[in-house]
């Protein structure tokens, strides 16, 4: 199926949301020296590729100072570290997966490499989720990004786990409707998006709710699917990726955009969490966004 309007709204909103958290709120930890380790438990990596995982998820991808590659030694690289950039013409096929905190390469590089790099780490992650709220809150095992100075991947078995890492916000498209706007087929698409925020302390949860409560009456440029900056492994397709530059370019060229009309923030209090089997010590919040996008639709 070709990407439809709702797909574009959600993916564009994700980019805006993540930029708000990482750049405006500065929910990042800078200059983390990462070591990447091979895992054969990668359920989403085919046999002709290998994945090496770091102890962290997610990496910050937004900005002009994001590393374009990693340092590799061992195998055909020899005993000294060589800097390998993500480049379509590079024989390693290196791709940096900023979402999973890993590098994916062609299987021919081997499984005994030493890989390192310096990446900024998000302290609040952002995900687009396919799960319903019930599945997300009641049937999902969350991994805490840091617990007793032990990274989450050191506290579980297996590097290839696809578990969500919190603190995090989970974005979903809840509902929409078209309303007549003007003659000639112009309609106003009202989109209702929700962010479920899960954190392990009230400071983080209150900060995220406050940040977005004050983000109403803001424009979110609609980015075409082919211009979405991330590829299949959540690698940057054409580095560097700078959302602020994309935002300014789109808005100055009168690109189609969604206007955030209203934002409502609520919290799920501990008194009800015990009855609903929500993970212990987790704080839950909801942010509801009402978006308006006047546009021409196909009848």
Task: Give residue spans per PLM region.
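Beta-strand secondary-structure signal
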Residues: 114-116, 190-196, 286-290
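Short, solvent-exposed beta-alpha or beta-beta edge segments that form flexible loop/patches at the rim
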Residues: 145-209, 269-278
């Amino acid at each position: 199926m070709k990407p439809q309007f709702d797909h574009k709204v959600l993916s564009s909103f994700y980019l805006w949301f993540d930029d708000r958290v990482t750049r405006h709120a500065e929910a990042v930890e800078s200059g983390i020296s990462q070591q990447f380790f091979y895992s054969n438990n990668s359920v989403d990596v085919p046999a002709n590729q290998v994945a090496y995982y770091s102890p962290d998820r997610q990496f910050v991808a937004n900005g002009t100072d994001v590393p374009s590659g990693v340092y590799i030694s061992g195998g055909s690289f020899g005993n000294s570290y060589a800097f390998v950039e993500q480049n379509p013409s590079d024989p390693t096929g290196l791709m940096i997966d900023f979402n999973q905190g890993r590098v994916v390469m062609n299987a021919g590089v081997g499984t005994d490499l030493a890989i390192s790099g310096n990446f900024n780490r998000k302290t609040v992650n952002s995900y687009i989720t396919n799960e319903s709220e019930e599945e997300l809150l009641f049937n999902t095992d969350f991994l805490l990004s840091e617990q007793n100075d032990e990274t989450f991947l050191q506290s579980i078995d297996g590097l290839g786990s696809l578990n969500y890492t919190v603190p995090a916000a989970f974005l979903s498209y809840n509902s929409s409707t078209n309303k007549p706007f003007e003659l000639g087929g112009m309609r106003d698409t009202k989109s209702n998006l929700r962010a479920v925020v899960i954190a392990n302390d009230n400071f983080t949860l209150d900060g995220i709710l406050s940040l977005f409560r004050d983000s109403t009456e803001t424009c979110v440029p609609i980015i075409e699917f082919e211009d979405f900056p991330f590829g299949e492994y959540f690698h940057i397709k054409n580095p560097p990726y700078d959302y602020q530059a994309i935002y300014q370019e789109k808005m100055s060229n009168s690109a189609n955009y969604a206007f955030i009309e209203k934002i409502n923030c609520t919290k799920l209090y501990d008194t009800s969490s015990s009855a609903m089997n929500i993970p212990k010590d987790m704080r839950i919040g909801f942010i509801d966004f009402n978006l308006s996008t006047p546009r021409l639709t196909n009848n």
